[in-house]
């Protein structure tokens, strides 16, 4: 499954070198990032974590509000992006909004920022510069995102995934 978000320090290029136990009852991912190992293994029982609450929110929105999330990102994708528009959307993201809109902005900004790099300043504000990706462009492949969403619906015996 393709990753739907780029993340610095991701494990996608290391998948063939990572050693994973042949059997396990529950998969724990302390630093989910882009989710390369999780999406590759597709475990039946998993718990994920990350220090970035906005990243965890993104996974929650994809899991719990897939259709509305896709709709929000599609609306953003219709914007003819320029540096000025990028900076305005980055400001909106940093000022805060509802959880669903924040997740949609996060993935939209990730596809348009310099090298897909999620970077924050000392205040904890996202400050990655514009990646000169002008115009309209898709932020995700719907079938891939829906496939990811359905795998996130796997839950442990207590009904928890994230």
Predicted region positions:
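Conserved S-adenosyl-L-methionine
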Residues: 21-78
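SAM-dependent nucleic-acid methyltransferase catalytic core
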Residues: 1-12, 21-24, 65-162
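A conserved donor-nucleotide-binding helix/loop in the catalytic core
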Residues: 15
């Amino acid at each position: 499954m393709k990753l739907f978000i780029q993340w610095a320090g991701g494990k996608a290029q290391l998948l063939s070198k990572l050693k994973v136990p042949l059997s396990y009852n529950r998969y724990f991912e302390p630093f989910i990032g882009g989710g390369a190992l999780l999406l590759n293994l597709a475990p039946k029982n998993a718990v994920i974590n990350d220090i970035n609450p906005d990243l965890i929110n993104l996974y929650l929105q994809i899991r719990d509000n897939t259709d509305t999330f896709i709709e929000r990102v599609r609306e953003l994708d219709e914007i003819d992006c320029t540096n000025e528009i990028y900076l305005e959307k980055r400001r909106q993201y940093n000022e805060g909004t509802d959880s669903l809109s924040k997740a949609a902005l996060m993935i939209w900004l990730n596809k348009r920022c310099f090298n897909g790099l999620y970077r924050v300043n000392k205040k904890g504000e996202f400050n990655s510069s514009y990646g000169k990706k002008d115009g309209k462009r898709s932020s995700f492949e719907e079938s891939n995102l829906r496939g990811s969403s359905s795998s996130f619906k796997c839950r442990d015996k207590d009904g928890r995934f994230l």
